[in-house]
Every structure is written in C-alpha cells, then in structure tokens.
C-alpha cells in the first residue's frame, strides 16, 4: 500500500515537473502572450490536474495523444507560437519526454535485467524511475534549450530562471 502511494506521489511530482518544463520551454522559445501571472498559474494547475487524470487511465496512446494536443493548444493560446514553427518545437519537446522515459527504463533494464512491463509492475522501481526521469528530462530540456537559443539573446535568460 505504501509502495503504491509512493508510486502515485512520484508520478504526480513527475507530472508537475513536466508541466513546469513545458511552460518554461514555451516561454523561452515562444514568449508569453499575456502578462497575467494568475492566468498562467490557473492554466498550470488545470494542465497538471488534467494530465494526472489522463495518466490514471494508463493507456499509452491516450497519454501521448493528450500530450500532443495539450502542448499544441497551450503554445497557441498562451504563448506567441508561430504556426509554421510550433509543430517543430513541440515535437522537439515531445522527443525530450519520450527519450527521458526510454533512457530511464533502459537504465533499469540494464542494471536489473527486467523488461519494461516488469519494471512498471514494481511500485518502488516506478517511484525511483519517476525521480530519475525528472533528472533526465531536466538535462534534456537544458541541452535542447541551449542549442535552440544559442543565437537568440531573449533565450539567454534561461540560465537565471530555469524551471
């Protein structure tokens, strides 16, 4: 019971961090459309809540579809995303999420020799995997943002207020 609770809490923390990174990434790459912190705060809370609910379904294609639609809608509604470019940047961020998950589970698979399904069924490994996933996501986020913003002076601010 405690292991399941820790697994759920770590998944929720992971979801919060994913959304912090998405909002931060979009702010750096696109720029905010509005000045209201309340609007972005409410949008963040709504996004985290919705993502946690979708994650509870535990159907990978549904999670992926939700994440794609959510990122596209968010980038257009709350950020100054150029319609021609936002598909590419959103795909890049989606790849960060995908590869961080793949790297995390590959790590456990290499160390323990377990398959993805076996790792998922072990709540303590899932909890630790979620925390490791956060680290890998953050590193991927920083690397990609540094690459995308190397010639853009507005993006250089990310070093002082990263996530």
Where are these regions (language model features)?
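Alpha-helical transmembrane segments
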Residues: 40-48
